[in-house]
């Protein structure tokens, strides 16, 4: 009890000191211990913008979130907390038409005070960290290479191809990919909205995959997540394979030219398909299967000779609902 009392008193004293320090530096603001300078510093955002030479290839080698979008000129804007900028500076270099963005880290170690709250965390995050890259609307990226990436978002662009390993999050909105979109390496959540590509291959171990309002003409498209959920909505595609182990899969209001296979070993499957499409379902004796409003057994099939076919397959623990 005595030790606990001493610890509480010590924490209160430290809190009072930190509050006083923060108040003396322009009011009560979040502060952290900067291990670079070994002193308390006020957490504040800093931003700097650099104009760039022309480039048509981009290498992302940073754990800070990166957004690539159209602008009037080639430039990069980096925003970080001041302490993190000193510890993890971001570098940008254009060489032979390739822009490489390196450095930067969201991690910040130390004690943080926000008001009267004191937190200590070896893996806290610089939530202000971000990198924004703009390219002229008339230009297109030939190659986007992901080396050490965490969050990458593409907006309103034309990109020939993507290579490398996805990190925590990959997003593309209003993007045309000239070549097959290969996102088969990594553990990222993948979000594609209004994306066009000849083919998409998206694979992730733990992330979710969401594809909406997009177009992929290939009949061999692949969306595959080991533990995440998969959603495919309002998308035009030749066909393909959607597969997950533990996650759920939802397909709704898509235009499929040939065959779409939807399979989960332990998750639930939900589909909204055209009234003229053929549908086959395969579950287990423990599965609840509903096909166009009617309860079915472990296997069922309607319109087997239709041009467009949907195949729903689930394992012992999964249910299937098709409307």
Regions found by a protein language model. Name each.
Residues 5-24:
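Hydrophobic membrane-insertion alpha-helices, especially the h-region
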Residues 112-124, 294-302:
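Acidic/polar low-complexity surface segments
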Residues 1-3:
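N-terminal Lys/Arg-rich, disordered targeting/topogenic segments
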Residues 94-96, 185, 204, 264:
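Generic beta-strand structural signal
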Residues 27-106, 110, 126-147, 151-165, ...:
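Short linear S-[DN]-x-LW-Φ motif typified by the pepsin-like aspartic protease active-site region
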Residues 192-194, 198-204, 208-323:
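Short, surface-exposed interaction patches in beta-rich subdomains
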Residues 62-64, 72, 82, 103-105, ...:
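A mature extracytoplasmic/lumenal domain signature
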Residues 143-145, 151, 160-163, 169, ...:
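Glycine- and aspartate-rich repeat motifs characteristic of hemolysin/RTX-like Ca2+-binding segments
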